[in-house]
């Protein structure tokens, strides 16, 4: 005997999986990818501004463009949360992540397989609301997730970019360090 699942249960299950009401974008699809992380309480205009960050490109030889740094710090100050970008080696924004005022939780990195490579080919660029240096959590994420680079842009009181702090993974060394800031 076949059991039918009522549509209401399907809708509830879908709402639990995707609280925003939207399915995640298909891989390789044309839809604008979702913003990950702590997006509850954001206005639709703020979510739209965060989604537009996916359209930005960074020259592969640069860490960040001045325009992108300003866009990141302005939205971060407005929503009073850290905002992070995962950028690949080609300069394409692959994920936009919203955190709390103190930290971001990096999205699932399964699509960036390590394989034989030592690093994932992804750099994390995020904001710090108090214009502070990289935290121990940032350095731990850098080392354990095998990111190419971890950078934090300080947000000044007027929303402009402040100092930029960065760290990268170092090869095996006598001191036993895994990162260098």
Predicted stretch roles:
Residues 5-117:
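Glycine-rich short-loop/terminal segments
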Residues 28, 40-41, 49-50, 150-181:
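Active-site or metal-binding loop neighborhoods of secreted/extracellular toxin and effector enzymes
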Residues 80-84, 120-122, 147-149:
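Short, surface-exposed beta-edge/turn micro-motifs
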Residues 84-86, 93-96, 142, 150-152, ...:
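Generic structural hydrophobic/aromatic packing signal, biased to beta-strands
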Residues 87-91, 129-130, 152-160:
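Short, flexible beta-strand-to-coil junctions
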Residues 96-146, 155-156:
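Short HxH-centered metal-ligating active-site micro-motif
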